[in-house]
Amino acid sequence: MLVLGIETTCDETAAAVVERHADGSALILSNIVRSQTGEHAPYGGVVPEIAARAHVDMLDGIIASAMKQSGVGFPRLSGVAAAAGPGLIGGVIVGLTTAKAIALVHRTPLIAVNHLEAHALTPRLTSALEFPYCLFLASGGHTQIVAVLGVGNYVRLGTTVDDAMGEAFDKVAKMLGLPYPGGPQVERAAADGDAKRFNFPRPMLGRPDANFSLSGLKTAVRNEAGRIDPLRPRDINDLCAGFQAAVLEATADRLGVGLELFRERFGTPRALVAAGGVAANQAIRGALEGVAARAQTMLIIPPPALCTDNGAMIAWAGAERLAAGLTDTLEAPPRARWLLDANAHAPAGFANTRAGF
C-alpha cells in the first residue's frame, strides 16, 4: 500500500510517501521536511501564529515535491495520513484540512494520526521489530516511557510531571544566551565543558515510579548561572556539561525502573526503543546504550532524521493503521492535546500539572 503522510504539528512542515509491503516491510519513496527555524530564531522559540502561517505558505509545495519525488500519482494512493495532534492547533488544522481535501477529491481513505503514535511506530519503519517493545519518547513537548503492545495499543509507564526534556534543554540554552534551537547548542557546549564543576540535582532518582521531573534541575542551572558575573564561554560550557550529565543520570535511572515495570506487566520487551528529537543527542544515545546493556535488551534508535518530526513517520503510522483496518471519517477533529494511552492519568500528586499531554 502507498500512503501520503503530512506533518504540521509544530515548526516542521513535512510530507512523505511510504510504501508498506504485505510482509510489513517498508520503503520510503520520498520524505520532504522544511524546518521553520529561521522564522522563529529571532523570538528564541516557536511562535504558534508564525508557525501556522508558514505551514499555509509551504505545505502545498512540499506535498507536490513529495509526490513528484516518489513517482506516485494521487490516484495510486491507498490512503492519506495527517498528524491530527497533539500539537499547536493552528498548524494541526492546516495539515489535517489539507489531508481531508486530498482524501475527498481522490476518494482515498483518511487516517488521522496521533503524532506520538507516529514516533512510537517509527522503529518498525526502519527495523524488522515485532511487538511488544518499550519506548522512550523524548521531544520538545513530551517525555514518556511507553509499552508499545500493538498498533493502537499503548500503556504509559512513566511521564514528566513538569517540563519535557527537549523543553528543558531549550530553556537552559535560552537562559545561557545560546542560539535557538537550543538543544543542539547545549549538546555542543557540554562536549567542551567540565561536568563535575557544578553539583546539580538528579531529580526523581531512586523513586519506584518511572516519572521524570526537570523543572528543579532547570532552576538549579539558572541559580548557578546567576552567581557568575560575567558569564564566560568556559562557564557556559561547564553549566551545559553539568546539566546534561544530570539529565543523563536521571534518564538512565528512570528508564531502568520503566523496564522493570514493563517486565512485571508485559514480560520481556523485544527492544528498548528511543524516538523524538532528543534521541538525536549523541550523549543521550550513549546513556541509552548503557541502560539497554544492563537490562540485557536490544536498543533501537532510528536515524536522526527520523527521530525529529517528519512526514515519513506520519505516512508509516497511517499505513500501519490502514493495514489494521483503522481509518477515519472527514469529521476527524484536530486536537491540541491527545493522549497516546487513553487510560493514562496524571501521576499521583501531580493532578494539576500538564503531565502526559
From Swiss-Prot:
Gene Ontology biological process terms, A to Z: tRNA threonylcarbamoyladenosine modification
Sites where the protein binds Fe cation: H115, H119, D309
NCBIfam families recorded: gcp_kae1 (TIGR00329), T6A_TsaD_YgjD (TIGR03723)
Enzyme class: transferase
Pfam families, per database record: TsaD (PF00814)
Species of the source: Nitrobacter hamburgensis (strain DSM 10229 / NCIMB 13809 / X14)
Keyword tags: Acyltransferase, Cytoplasm, Iron, Metal-binding, Transferase, tRNA processing
Domain of life: Bacteria
Main location class: cytoplasm
Manner of cofactor binding, per the entry note: Binds 1 Fe(2+) ion per subunit.
Subcellular location per the Swiss-Prot or TrEMBL entry: Cytoplasm
Family from the record: Belongs to the KAE1 / TsaD family.
InterPro entries (alphabetical): ATPase_NBD, Gcp-like_dom, KAE1/TsaD, Peptidase_M22_CS, TsaD
GO cellular component: cytoplasm
Catalytic activity: L-threonylcarbamoyladenylate + adenosine(37) in tRNA = N(6)-L-threonylcarbamoyladenosine(37) in tRNA + AMP + H(+)
Cofactor requirement: Fe(2+)
Protein name per Swiss-Prot or TrEMBL: tRNA N6-adenosine threonylcarbamoyltransferase
Chain residues that bind substrate: L137, A138, S139, G140, G141, D170, G183, N281
EC number: 2.3.1.234
Entry's Gene Ontology molecular function annotations: iron ion binding; N(6)-L-threonylcarbamoyladenine synthase activity
Function: Required for the formation of a threonylcarbamoyl group on adenosine at position 37 (t(6)A37) in tRNAs that read codons beginning with adenine. Is involved in the transfer of the threonylcarbamoyl moiety of threonylcarbamoyl-AMP (TC-AMP) to the N6 group of A37, together with TsaE and TsaB. TsaD likely plays a direct catalytic role in this reaction.
